[in-house]
Amino acid sequence: MTMYALELSFSDDPARLEGRPAHRERLAALRDEGKLLAAGPYADESGALLLYRVDTRAEAEAIVADDPYYSGPGVSVVSLKEWLPVTLAAELG
Protein backbone atom coordinates (compact mmCIF):
# COMPACT_ATOMS: atom_id res chain seq x y z
CA MET A 1 0.00 0.00 0.00
CA THR A 2 1.10 3.52 -0.75
CA MET A 3 0.34 6.69 1.18
CA TYR A 4 -0.88 9.90 -0.43
CA ALA A 5 -1.24 13.35 1.10
CA LEU A 6 -4.08 15.50 -0.19
CA GLU A 7 -3.79 19.20 0.57
CA LEU A 8 -6.83 21.45 0.24
CA SER A 9 -7.21 25.21 0.29
CA PHE A 10 -10.41 26.89 1.52
CA SER A 11 -11.85 30.26 0.58
CA ASP A 12 -14.30 32.25 2.69
CA ASP A 13 -17.26 31.08 0.57
CA PRO A 14 -19.94 29.97 3.09
CA ALA A 15 -21.36 27.55 0.49
CA ARG A 16 -18.39 25.27 1.30
CA LEU A 17 -20.05 24.29 4.55
CA GLU A 18 -23.14 22.93 2.78
CA GLY A 19 -21.21 19.98 1.35
CA ARG A 20 -19.29 19.18 4.51
CA PRO A 21 -21.73 16.75 6.22
CA ALA A 22 -21.85 14.39 3.21
CA HIS A 23 -18.08 14.76 2.80
CA ARG A 24 -17.47 13.77 6.41
CA GLU A 25 -19.73 10.73 6.04
CA ARG A 26 -17.64 9.68 3.06
CA LEU A 27 -14.45 10.20 5.07
CA ALA A 28 -15.81 7.97 7.85
CA ALA A 29 -16.55 5.22 5.32
CA LEU A 30 -13.04 5.49 3.85
CA ARG A 31 -11.58 5.35 7.37
CA ASP A 32 -13.60 2.21 8.11
CA GLU A 33 -12.28 0.66 4.87
CA GLY A 34 -8.72 1.40 6.00
CA LYS A 35 -8.11 3.84 3.13
CA LEU A 36 -8.09 7.07 5.16
CA LEU A 37 -5.50 7.41 7.92
CA ALA A 38 -6.14 10.97 9.05
CA ALA A 39 -8.03 14.06 7.95
CA GLY A 40 -8.70 17.49 9.30
CA PRO A 41 -8.59 21.23 8.76
CA TYR A 42 -5.67 23.48 9.57
CA ALA A 43 -6.16 25.48 12.77
CA ASP A 44 -6.32 28.72 10.79
CA GLU A 45 -9.12 27.26 8.61
CA SER A 46 -7.17 28.01 5.42
CA GLY A 47 -7.39 24.42 4.23
CA ALA A 48 -7.01 20.80 5.24
CA LEU A 49 -4.70 17.80 5.03
CA LEU A 50 -5.82 14.22 4.40
CA LEU A 51 -3.66 11.08 4.40
CA TYR A 52 -4.80 8.11 2.32
CA ARG A 53 -3.39 4.58 2.15
CA VAL A 54 -4.32 2.95 -1.14
CA ASP A 55 -2.83 0.60 -3.73
CA THR A 56 -2.28 3.07 -6.57
CA ARG A 57 -2.26 6.74 -7.43
CA ALA A 58 -5.25 6.06 -9.67
CA GLU A 59 -7.18 4.88 -6.62
CA ALA A 60 -6.27 8.06 -4.72
CA GLU A 61 -7.32 10.17 -7.70
CA ALA A 62 -10.62 8.27 -7.91
CA ILE A 63 -11.34 8.98 -4.24
CA VAL A 64 -10.86 12.69 -4.88
CA ALA A 65 -12.90 12.62 -8.10
CA ASP A 66 -15.79 10.76 -6.42
CA ASP A 67 -16.27 13.31 -3.63
CA PRO A 68 -18.15 16.41 -4.84
CA TYR A 69 -16.81 18.41 -1.87
CA TYR A 70 -13.39 18.66 -3.53
CA SER A 71 -14.81 20.41 -6.59
CA GLY A 72 -17.46 22.40 -4.75
CA PRO A 73 -17.52 26.09 -3.90
CA GLY A 74 -14.78 27.32 -1.62
CA VAL A 75 -12.57 24.22 -1.91
CA SER A 76 -9.48 23.85 -4.09
CA VAL A 77 -7.21 20.83 -4.36
CA VAL A 78 -3.67 22.14 -3.90
CA SER A 79 -1.86 18.84 -4.35
CA LEU A 80 -2.11 15.08 -4.21
CA LYS A 81 1.35 13.64 -3.60
CA GLU A 82 2.77 10.27 -2.73
CA TRP A 83 4.09 10.46 0.82
CA LEU A 84 7.01 8.39 2.12
CA PRO A 85 6.93 8.50 5.92
CA VAL A 86 10.25 7.98 7.64
CA THR A 87 8.55 7.17 10.91
CA LEU A 88 4.91 6.49 11.65
CA ALA A 89 2.88 5.92 14.80
CA ALA A 90 1.62 2.34 15.02
CA GLU A 91 -2.02 3.41 14.96
CA LEU A 92 -1.46 5.03 11.55
CA GLY A 93 0.55 2.20 10.04
How should these model regions be labeled?
Residues 1-93:
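Conserved, structured core segments of small domains
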